[in-house]
Amino acid sequence: MTEQVRIEPVIDYLTGLQDRICQGIAGADGSGEFKEDSWTREEGGGGRSRVLTEGAVFEQAGINFSHVTGASLPPSATAHRPELAGRRFQATGVSLVIHPRNPYVPTSHANVRFFIAEKEGAEPIWWFGGGFDLTPYYGEDEDCVHWHRVAKAACEPFGPEVYPRYKQWCDEYFFLRHRNEPRGVGGLFFDDLNEWGFEKSFAFMRSVGDHYLDAYLPIVARRKDTPYGERERDFQLYRRGRYVEFNLVYDRGTLFGLQSGGRTESILMSLPPLVRWRYNWQPEPGTPEARLYEHFLKPREWVE
């Protein structure tokens, strides 16, 4: 018997997830509030973007839900999958990036998504994707271990091989080839997930989405009151430049969104509000800034 593939329960889950994460982030901030911007897309679908700016803890937090439909796919989607050409599609997901004010609090990103392409007389082509990853400026081993423990816990019900596979994929995906360095300390990344069938794949996507706040909020609570000065802030803004470079050059979601006529404001919501580039800057040996490169920006096993 063929398993039924339905987008409606996925949309229900994702809108609820956006609500829960907004509540968790606003609660951790203590003073900031999310402003909602609902939008529709001429070709079909729409979404709701929620942004918290100038909070006590978070300089900017963007949490976006979208459900877009179209009669055909953009080149970024069909280049490696010619079987998708000529199919109508639906894509839905929640994507978020949290940029904290304090340089001792890492930036975090999470995304869970579902894609389906259909045409008359043919089986639908569908998959799930997503993950979450952490980008510290002044890293702490304790935080990285906690982040990866929660990532592993999200995967464990689905088999012992799942966390190592998606942890490695995350390390490989969030890598700036032109800098030859990782974006951060990783986490989970998965895409094109359909081999488990619809229900199990959907359950895994939910597990990843449901574990994000457990992974991030304890780190925020530990670091948000750490004293810092101009030097730390300057380094944070410099390292944010790497975030911008990755999102505009490599990120699949950004490229897909821009090529498919997505909503530019929502797609670029992931970019930090302030950022700084410096020509050929290098950290002084033996400094906390150098330790980020030497100790944290090297893929490693954080949990057994």
Curated annotation (Swiss-Prot):
UniProt cofactor(s): a divalent metal cation
Record bears the keyword Disulfide bond: no
Domain of life: Bacteria
Signal is among the record's keywords: no
Catalytic activity: coproporphyrinogen III + O2 + 2 H(+) = protoporphyrinogen IX + 2 CO2 + 2 H2O
EC numbers for this chain: 1.3.3.3
Enzyme type, top EC level: oxidoreductase
Signal sequence, start to end: none
Residues of the site described as Important for dimerization: 178
A family per Pfam: Coprogen_oxidas
GO biological process, one term: protoporphyrinogen IX biosynthetic process
Pathways involved: Porphyrin-containing compound metabolism; protoporphyrin-IX biosynthesis; protoporphyrinogen-IX from coproporphyrinogen-III (O2 route): step 1/1
Active-site feature positions: 109
Binding site for substrate: 95, 111-113, 261-263
Main location: cytoplasm
Keyword annotations: Cytoplasm, Heme biosynthesis, Metal-binding, Oxidoreductase, Porphyrin biosynthesis
Protein location: Cytoplasm
UniProt family annotation: Belongs to the aerobic coproporphyrinogen-III oxidase family.
SUBUNIT field: Homodimer.
Function: Involved in the heme biosynthesis. Catalyzes the aerobic oxidative decarboxylation of propionate groups of rings A and B of coproporphyrinogen-III to yield the vinyl groups in protoporphyrinogen-IX.
Name this polypeptide is given: Oxygen-dependent coproporphyrinogen-III oxidase
The organism of origin for this protein: Thioalkalivibrio sulfidiphilus (strain HL-EbGR7)
